[in-house]
């Protein structure tokens, strides 16, 4: 739509809405209850043919936000009214001033609606003026987490263009940090950490301008958690990782030293969020932290205290080839009590949710020789325990058991193919929908595995397996509804 020309011909619902608003002062308690339905009727009357005349009510619809009525019908009407309009069209109606007001509205839905509408602007052409941009920045401080998160994503995307990145730098000063509470500091630090990953130049500017204030020496738990999250964000780009891992900043050393302290929500966050991601992206750094700070020993000591976080983390370590090789080098494979996977841990793998979650991670090991090394030291009843757990009444336990069975089917399907009880379980037709899908997926994965596939010795079960794979996961006539009803 290149231009909007207001023409006569407003539909009847539009005229009725205007009349209701005109009569509102005479009987407000009655008329105000009719307005939401009138707005809905007006929305239904908007068509490509009537839209030009309906746009004459834009001011009127926007004024309805001031009434004590639900905001949903107003936003739906606005959404349909403005749907095909470009930012240039919207600017002809003075949309920026409306949006500045809308971003201060007490309704979260209205604020988010306005933030979404701003995405129609061409940021490369600098179509967002400074007053509106400042209103977007103010949304970071909103009482609504949803509004703050939406504004953060919007500013992050706009900062692809240096003009808006520089506006953020210009409008935010170090003094702002000094007067902010912990919640707001967390929001702004998170935004600046994300912006730092866009380019080395942005990182340099944020550091030079005291925007990226990363401080690991905090007593406030919110800031402690945010310290971990900020470093986690900066793992993602090579240049930000180089910065946080340098000898100058020593942030990784701080993380490792803090993790060795007492178990609390801060160190749990390190073990659950930061170290697994570091292991995935930069496994050599994990080994380096062990050489400098005996990180592996610290994790194993925490595991002995039944610490679920460290048990999960160790499974992540075992899923990485580089880290697993370092564990074997340090602890060996012979001493059952102290080897790289202690005997007690192999039993814990099969006991509870943290143990089985850790086991599922460990079975992701991509190196086949290391995968088989792990399998050889597992308890003899590992497969039977997994099959039994796959029938557990607890949904999460079933899911984890099948997750492990899927990894086994992919990496060493002979372990399942050689056990009749396991094949019989996978061929069962009854069960809830999810269970039937998972059984089918394990069978399918076995047949497609590069470690045997169709050549596996299925014996008398071969025809049944092929038939099931042709039928699909849900067998016609199987009593899945009964089980599903019992589960519900």
UniProtKB/Swiss-Prot annotation:
One of its GO terms (cellular component) is nucleus. It is found in: Cytoplasm; Nucleus. This is Uncharacterized protein C18.17c. The keyword Nucleus applies. Its main location: cytoplasm. InterPro entries: ARM-type_fold, PSMD5. One of its GO terms (molecular function) is protein folding chaperone. The keyword Nucleus applies. It comes from Schizosaccharomyces pombe (strain 972 / ATCC 24843) (Fission yeast). Keywords: Cytoplasm, Nucleus. GO terms for biological process: proteasome regulatory particle assembly.
């Amino acid at each position: 739509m290149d231009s909007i020309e207001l023409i006569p011909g407003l539909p009847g619902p539009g005229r009725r809405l205007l009349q209701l608003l005109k009569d509102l002062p005479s009987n407000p308690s009655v008329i105000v209850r009719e307005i939401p339905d009138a707005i809905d009727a007006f929305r239904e009357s908007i068509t490509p043919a009537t839209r030009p005349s309906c746009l004459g009510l834009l001011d009127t619809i926007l004024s309805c936000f001031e009434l004590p009525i639900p905001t949903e019908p107003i936003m739906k009407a606005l959404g349909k009214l403005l749907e095909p309009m470009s930012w240039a069209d919207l600017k002809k109606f003075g949309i920026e001033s409306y949006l500045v007001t809308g971003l201060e509205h007490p309704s979260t839905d209205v604020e988010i609606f306005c933030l979404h509408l701003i995405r129609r602007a061409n940021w490369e052409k600098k179509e967002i003026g400074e007053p509106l941009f400042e209103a977007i920045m103010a949304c970071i401080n909103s009482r609504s987490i949803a509004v703050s998160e939406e504004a953060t994503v919007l500013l992050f995307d706009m900062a692809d263009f240096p003009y808006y990145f520089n506006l953020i730098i210009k409008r935010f000063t170090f003094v702002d940090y000094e007067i902010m509470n912990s919640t707001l500091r967390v929001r702004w630090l998170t935004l600046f950490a994300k912006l730092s990953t866009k380019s080395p130049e942005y990182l340099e500017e944020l550091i030079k301008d005291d925007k990226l204030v990363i401080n690991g020496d905090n007593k406030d738990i919110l800031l402690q958690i945010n310290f971990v999250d900020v470093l986690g964000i900066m793992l993602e780009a090579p240049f930000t990782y180089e910065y946080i891992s340098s000898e100058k900043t020593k942030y990784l050393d701080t993380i490792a030293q803090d993790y060795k302290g007492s178990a609390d929500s801060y160190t749990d966050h390190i073990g659950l969020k930061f170290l697994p991601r570091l292991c995935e992206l930069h496994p050599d750094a994990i080994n380096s932290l062990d050489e400098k700070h005996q990180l592996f020993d610290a994790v194993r000591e925490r595991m002995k205290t039944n610490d679920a976080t460290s048990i999960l983390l160790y499974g992540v370590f075992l899923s990485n080839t580089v880290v697993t090789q370092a564990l074997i080098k340090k602890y060996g494979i012979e001493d059952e009590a102290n080897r790289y996977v202690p005997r007690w841990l192999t039993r814990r793998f099969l006991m509870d949710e943290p143990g089985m979650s850790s086991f599922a991670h460990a079975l992701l090991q991509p190196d086949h020789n290391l995968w088989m090394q792990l399998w050889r030291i597992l308890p003899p009843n590992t497969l039977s325990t997994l099959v039994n757990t796959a029938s557990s009444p607890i949904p999460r336990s079933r899911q984890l058991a099948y997750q492990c069975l899927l990894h086994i089917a992919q990496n060493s399907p002979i372990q399942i193919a050689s056990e009749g009880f396991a094949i019989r379980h996978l061929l069962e037709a009854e069960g809830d929908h999810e269970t039937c899908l998972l059984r089918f997926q394990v069978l399918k994965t076995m047949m497609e595995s590069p470690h045997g596939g169709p050549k596996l010795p299925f014996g008398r079960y071969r025809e049944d397996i092929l038939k099931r794979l042709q039928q699909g996961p849900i067998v016609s006539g199987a009593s899945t509804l009964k089980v599903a009803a019992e589960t519900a």
